[in-house]
Amino acid sequence: MPSSPYGANASTSHQHVKQNAHPSAPLSRTSPSLPPKPTVAMNGNGHYHAAPTSVALDKNKQTATSSHNLMIGVPPAATPNLSLAQSRPPDSKQSSDADGHPVFLSSAKGKQKQVDPIHIPLAQLEQELPLEEADLISLAALVERLANFGYEALQNLAETLPSLPSSSKRAKIFNTALNVRKQFIKLLVLARWSKDISDLQKSRNIIALLSEQQWQHEDVFAGLTDIRKILPNARMRNADLPTAIDVLHTGTYRRLPASIKQMAVAPKPFTDQQALLIVSRLEDALRTRMACRELVPAPLSNYTIHDGKVHFHVPGLFQAQLTASGSAQHELTPSSSDDRWWLLDLTFDVIASGSCAASCNRAFPRKPKRAYRERLRVWGDQQLSPVIQSDGVDESNARPLDIAADKTEQGTDVQIAPEKPTDAPTVNEANPAITATHHDDSLMPTAPVQRDAPLSRLFAFLQERALHYQMDILQHQAYELCRLNWGSNLRIETAERPRNLTVHYWTQAQGAAGATQRVESAAAGGSVQITIVDLPDTPGATETLAALFDGDDDQSSTTHDTASLTTVKRRGLQVTWDADRSILADAQSNNLAISPHSLDIEALLSSVIKQHTLALLRNLQRRILVSDHALSRLLRPEDCTLCLEHIQRQGDEFSTATETTTFNFLQIDLHASQRPRTAKSKPNPKPEQRSASCLAPLRLSVDPVTGRLLLDSEPAQSTTDLSSEQTSQQAASFTASILTTRPNYARLAEASDRINESIDALLDVLYRLDVFARVQEWERMASYLGLRSVRKLALRPQDLAKLGASTLASAEAAPQLFLPLRQSFGGYFLALQPSELAGVSIALVYVVQVMDPTGTPALSVQSIEWLDRAKIAAAASKVGSSGEDVGQEFVATEAGTKRKAPPGVQGETNDVDANFGSSELTIEELADVHSYCIALVSYFRVEQQLRMRGLPYLHVGSNTMRSSPPCKRQRRQQTADARDDGLFGEDASGGTASSDDEAFAGPAGVAGVAALVPSLCLRSIDVLGPSKSHLAKPNISLRVRHWDDDEKLCVEMRIKLRMKSRQFRTLHEVVALAASSDQQSTCALTWIDFDREASLLTLTTRDLDNCMSIFHTHWERVMRMVQLTREVLNASRAWQQRALRLRRSCKKPGERVELCRFELDSVVFSYGSIKVDGLEAKLLVRVRWQDAKLEMQAFSPIGVTQSGGYILEFGSMRSVQVEALDQDAQLREDGVSRWFDETHCLANPHKVMALELRRTVNVAARSAAMHAMLQPQAERIVWRGFLELLQHTLPLVREMAPLVDKCLTHAHVPEVEIKSATWFRFRFQDRYAIDVRLATRSRLVVSDASRALFASEVRTSESESESETTDAVPLDAVFGGSQLLNDLLDATTLARKCSKPKTRIAAQLSSAQFGPIPNIEHVLRSVHAKLDAITWIDARDHRSSAARLRVYELGRALLISLPSASHPNAQAAYHAIAHLVPLLIDRVEAQLARSTP
C-alpha cells in the first residue's frame, strides 16, 4: 500500500522529489537507510512479491509511472519528500483526509499544532495541478503560420500582377485580399477566444487531477481487495515442532519446498561494472546526506539525485548540479576540508520574450557562455568550501546570513524548514550497538558545535547572480526599443548600487507642437523603475505557536538555530510606476511584476501605458459628462463609455509575427442611435432594433507611442461580445459609413489638432457634430420610409417663436427637418426639433401660405400640437386596458378642442423609465408617429363633418377614458362578436325586435399604432333619426381604416341591425366607382357590406371629406329594405309570440308570411299558397325601391320626371323550391328573376290588383314620412297594414282573378272592377253592381252599389266644415292593418279629411250610374244563410267554434268579421270566404233573371 496519505507517488529510476511534497518524518540517526516495510503486490503473472510502499498500481494493476504527485493542500517543506521515503513513525505528522479537515502536526511531546488548509494560497494549489497539454496547439504557431501565409500571398501577388491585364489586376488584388482577410478573421476569432485560455487550461488540469485521483482510488480499492483475499493465507499455523527440531539441531530445514527457496533465499551478487557500482554507492551516500545530515534551505528543497549528482532547480532563478565527496560526518563533528560540495554545472532559469527575444537569446543564453560559466563555478566552489569552527563563528558575526525570526506564512516563495522535535531520540538511544568509545564520549559534556550550511551560502550567491542576469536582459531590451521602435519617445537611466533600471515614456508628448496645453499634467509621460530588492518575510502561524508553547524548553532554542541556518533571504525584481497623482488614483492596479519566464520590457511598458491611457480616458470621461456644456446635459453615461478592442499588431524588425493586443478608447455616441427604449413597467423588455447610423460613433484614443489624443470615427463594433443583431447592423451601415468616411476624416483630423491644443474645444466640436448627425439620421430614416423631407420652411420670425423661445437665440434649437404628411393633406408637416433632454421633439404643424407686407409669400403656422412620446409609448404598452364605465354620459367634443389623455393614462406614463425621455428617434418610432399623425388628421376631418351636422360623438377605446360606448342601463357584460369589433351587444331575448338594452364589450385584438387611435361612437337616434333608430342598435361605430396607405384609406360606418334570419346571406355591393391611381382602371369608391351572421351593415367610402353625406344617402336607400325585412320577420314569428302569450302550443300556420331573400335593394317574401297544375305553389312578392329620374321622351327634347317609389312585383314559386332555397343560400340572381316572369306572375292572383297595391303603398309611405317627426311609428304601421291587406284580400282575389278573363268571353259572367286596394265591384248587365269592401278591424262589407251605405256619404257641407275641425285621432287609428280604408269608413280620421270630397262624388256617381238590384234584402239574407251553413260544417269538421265565420245581416248589407291571419284556425274561415263570391254572383244573377221580363 502507498505510504503517502495523499495518494500514491509514482517511483522512477531517478527519484524525482517535489518541492511542495509533504515532509517525511525524521529518520533515525543510527539507521538512516533502513528499508521501508514491504507490502505485498501482484505482478501481471498473478504471483505475489514484495513491493516498496511508494509503488502504486494503475487501473490495469500495473505499476504506476505517472510523474504527478497528488499532494494537494500540503504545506511546503524544507526537507524534500523522497520517493523512496521510509514508513512514518508513530510520532510523525498526521495529515487530514480528503474531506478538507484541518491538518494536525504532532510533535515528540504529543502536542498537536494545527495548520488550517484554508490559508494555503490558491496559486500554490494551482501549481500542484498536473499540466494537461494534450490536443492543444500554440497560438504563436498559428499566428506565425498565418503571417507567413499572408506574406507569401503578397509576394505571389507582386510577382504575378505585372503580367496581368489591367482589368484582371483589380480582380486579382480583390480576390487575394479577400482570401487573406478570411484567414485573419479566423485568427481574430481564435485570438479573442484565447483570452479565456487560462481558465480553460485550469479546467483541463483539474479534470486531469480528478481523473488521476479516480484511477488511484480504484487502485487502492483493488489493492485492498487483493490484501483481503491473501490475508487468510497469512494466518499463523500451529507450532511446527518437527521443523523447529530440525532447525535447532542441524541449522537448516531440509523439508523446504523449492518454490520457497527461490523466493526467500537471496540471489547471488551481480557482476556489473565497477563504475556503475561506484555511482550507485555515491547516490546512496548523497541521499543519506541530503536526508539526514545536510542543512538544505527551503528554496533548494526541490532536487533530484541521479548519475551521481544532485540536481537543484529553483524556479525563476537557476538550475545547478552538485556533488559531494561522501555521506558527510556527524552533525556534532567539526567540518573537514575533505568533506565538501562541488559545483559542477549552472543554468539560469530565464526566458526572454517579445520582439527582442531573438537578440536577447543570442547575447544572454540560458546557459551562460563558457568563460562566464567558469567564473561562476569557481565563485560557487568558494561559497561551498567548508568553514572551520572558529572561522565559522567569526564569519557569522561579520557577515551573517539573513535569517527570518519566525516562519513565513504559507503561500509565499520562502520555504519553511521543518521543526526538529525537542524530544527526538539521541544517537545513543537509537543505536544501542555503538562502540564503548562513543558511549563514553556521550557521557562527557561537550561544547556546542556550530553547524556549517554551505548550500545556504551557495543559494544566496546564485540568487544574486541570477537577478543581475535578468537585469542585464531587461536593459538590453530597453536599448533595443530606443534604437528601433520607440525612438526619441523613450529615455533610459541606469544605476549600479543599488542596481536599478528606469525607463521614461512619452518624453516628446508635451514638447510637441500644439501639445503645450494638454489636460493639465495628466497626459504627461511617466516612468517605470526596476530594482533588485529584498522580499519581505512574514512570520508564520506555526512558528509563532511553537515559540509560545516551547519557549521554556532548552530544546526549542536548538530547533530555532537549526531552522535559522536553513532560512535564507529571498530577493527579487520590483517594478515601480511613477506618474501624475491623478493618473495613479484612477489606475485600476499599481501592482506590476516581471516573470522570469517571460522577460519582456516592451510588454511591461505597454501594460503601464495601457493603465495610463485608461486613467487618462476616465479623467476625460468625467470632464465630458459633468461639465455645464449643453453636450454634457445631452449625453448619458452610456453614451460616453470606455471600450476595449482587440487588434493585431504587425511584426517589425525583431519579429515578423502578428501579435494580438488590446486597445482602450473612449467611445462617444453623439446622436445615440443605439439607445435602447425600455420601461420600468415591463419585466422583460425587448431591445429594439438598432438603426444604422449615417455617422458612426466617435472614438477618443491615445497614441501609445507618442501620447497624443486622437479623435476618429468608429469603423465597426469594438466590443468583444457582438450579437447577431449587431452583426447584421454592421452590414446595413456599410454604405453609409463608406460615404461619410472621406469628409469626416478631414473634419476629425482638424478636431484632433484642436483637442491637443485645448481640451475645452472638445465639447464644442462634439456638440456641432451631434446636431449634424441627428439631422442626417432623421433624413436618412425618412428616405428609408419613403417620406419626403425639407430642411427649412419659409416661416416668419413670429412663427418661429411659436416653436419655442430658444429658436430665435440659436439656429441649432430650431426645427431642422420638416416631413410633409401626405399630398392629400396639404399644409400638414411633422417638425423634428433637437432637444437637450428628449433628444428630439416632434410637433404636428399646420401651415398656410400668406403674403408679407412687402408682397413676398411666406408660411404662417396656424396650429401646433406637440406629441408626447412618453405618453404614446405608455398607451401602446397598455393596449386593451379596460376603463371605467361611463354609463349614460355622452359628451360632445367641441370644435377646435384638443384630445386630452385621461388620468389613468397619465399615471401609466409616470411609470415609464426616466431614461426614455432622452432616447433618440428610431425608424420604427418615426413610422409610428407619422402614421399616428395621419390618423389624427383623418379623424379631424371626419369630426369636422360631424360638428357641422351637429352630431355628438364619443372617442371609444385606445388611450381614452372610455373603453366602451354608453349603455342605457348597467348590465352584465357579454362576449362581443369578433366581427363587430366589440361595439354591439347581443339582445337579451334573442329576438330581432327586442329591447334596446345592450351590453357592451371593448375592442380586442388591436395592436401597434391602431391601438393609439380611438374610434368614434355615435348614437343611432342622432344619425338615423327617431323614426329609423329602432332598426339598429343604440350605438354606431365610425372609424378610419388604412390611414397609413393613401390608396386604401377609407371611412367605415358599422351599424348593427335588429334582425336575424337564416335566409340572410353575406352581401357586398359596390355603389360607386372611381379611377385608380394608374388612370387605366377603376376601383371601388363606395361599397356596402352585410354580414349575415352578425347582422352587421358596413358602409365604406374613400371620400374622406364627404363621407357623412355619402353614408346618409346610401343608408336612406338601404333603410327601406331593412324596415320591410324587419316587419316581414315580425309577421312570420307572430304565431310564436301568440303561443308564448297564451302559454299554449299551437300549430304553425300554413298561410304565414316568410322571408325568402334579402338584398340591399330588394326584398322577396311569401304570404300564401295556391294550387297550380295540381301542385302547391308559394305566392311571392318582390319589393324594390326606384329613385326619381328624368326620362327623355321620343321626338321631344323635354324630359319627363319619373317619381320614385316602391315597385311591387308578384310571382310564384313551387314549395319544393322553397326548401331548396333554404339549403342553397347562394342562389344565383337569374333564378330569382325567373320567379317573377310572366308565367309565374300570372299564377299569383294579386297580379290583377298590383297597380292599386303599389299606389296604396306609396301614398301611405309618403304620408308616414311627412308625419315621421310627430309619429315615428307611422312607417312601421304601413308595412304591417300591407302584409295584413295581402292576407285578407287573398281569399277574394283567388275567386276574382279567374273572373277578370272570363268576363271577356262569357256574357253571363259579371265584369270585375277594382276600384282600389280595398274596394271591388261586380257589374251585372252594366246596370247593376255589387260592392265588396274591406273595412276596419278585419271586416268585409257587401252592399248594393246604387245605394249609399252610410249617412256620412251624403252629409251636408256644414257638417263637413265641422268635422274638419275635429282633433286628430290616436296613432292606432292611422294605417293600422286594414285601416288603409278608414278614409272611407271613419269620418273622424286624418285620412278622411283629405279624401272626403272624392268619396262623396263617387257615391253620387254610383247612385246615378247603377240601378238598385231588385229584392236585394232577400238576396243578402239567402247569402247569409248559406254562409252560416258552410261555416257550421267547417267548424264541426275542425271541432272548434273559433273557426266559424261571423256574418251579420244589416238589411242593405252584409258584415263579415274575418279572423286574424296569425290565428291557428284562420284557414277554415278563409275557406268559407272563398264561397262568398260564387254564391253572391249566383244569387244576384238568379234574382235579376226572375225580375227581367
UniProtKB/Swiss-Prot annotation:
The keyword Transcription applies. It is found in: Nucleus. Residues 90-100 have a biased composition (Basic and acidic residues). One of its GO terms (molecular function) is transcription coregulator activity. Residues 1-51, 71-110, 408-427, 674-693, 894-913, 957-997 are annotated as: Disordered. GO terms for biological process: regulation of transcription by RNA polymerase II. InterPro entries: Med14_N, Mediator_Med14. The keyword Cell membrane does not apply. Component of the Mediator complex, a coactivator involved in the regulated transcription of nearly all RNA polymerase II-dependent genes. Mediator functions as a bridge to convey information from gene-specific regulatory proteins to the basal RNA polymerase II transcription machinery. Mediator is recruited to promoters by direct interactions with regulatory proteins and serves as a scaffold for the assembly of a functional preinitiation complex with RNA polymerase II and the general transcription factors. Belongs to the Mediator complex subunit 14 family. Component of the Mediator complex. This is Mediator of RNA polymerase II transcription subunit 14. The gene is RGR1.
